[in-house]
Amino acid sequence: ALVVYIVFWIIIYKKEKIKWVWVSIHNIKKRFIENFQFFISSVAGHVSIHGGLIILANFVNNTILGEFALAQKIALLMRMVPIFFTQAILQKASILFENNKIEFNSYVNRIFIIGLSITFGMGLIAIILSKWIIFLLAGSYVIYSETILKILAFIPFLSMLNFNNMIKILVDEKKHLLARATWITAIIMLILATIGSYYYGGYGLSIALVLTEIVSFIVYSVLLIKNKHERA
């Protein structure tokens, strides 16, 4: 396998005529810092998404934990929709940001409205069909999972509220703001999740996750406004 891998890369290097170039220590250090900021942002994102379930495991039995996890998996899948929107327009948004700020704002706001409409509709459908969605996945009616899903159904919509902020951070390469915002959000989520899980179990954690999306929107907005004033 190693030999095949090496041969494969040799062929690519020769075919594409790739040349080795010495990179300065300064550039290596700069890229390392940038990538490290993305890395810690990703870690914070995983903490925000999966940390709650780990906390809940300390306060409920395995049956309740499994029923909660079933509903959360559906909500997490739905939460990918705002991420798909961000990835889909990022390249075009970056070009518009460099060349035409007015068109950039118009384009991003237009996609933002579309995203809000779609995620809101998804939330309504998930609430209305929650009983049958759980039955389809579990093979039986699980009232607890159904109720949890109804609470978590609007997480994609609330996550979409942060769409504009995320696009602005990414196109302007404000990696330090992204790292700070994700970790502030993660820490607040851990606090809310611990309190909610301790007093109300899965229901408390569900509400904590919903509140975390609202907190995330506020944190990103405040940091962007503060950064704008500092640069003015």
Q: Which ranges hold each PLM region?
A:
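Interfacial transmembrane-helix starts/ends
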Residues: F32, K101-S117, I125-L129, E146-L149
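Interhelical loop/hinge segments that connect adjacent transmembrane helices in multipass membrane
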Residues: I6-I49, K92-S106, N227-A232
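Interfacial/gating helices of multi-pass transporter permease domains
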Residues: N27-E34, F38, I55-A75, I143-E146, ...
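Hydrophobic alpha-helical transmembrane segments
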Residues: A1-K15, Q72, I184-I188, G202-K226
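Interfacial segments at transmembrane-helix termini and the short loops linking adjacent helices
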Residues: I128-M160, Y203
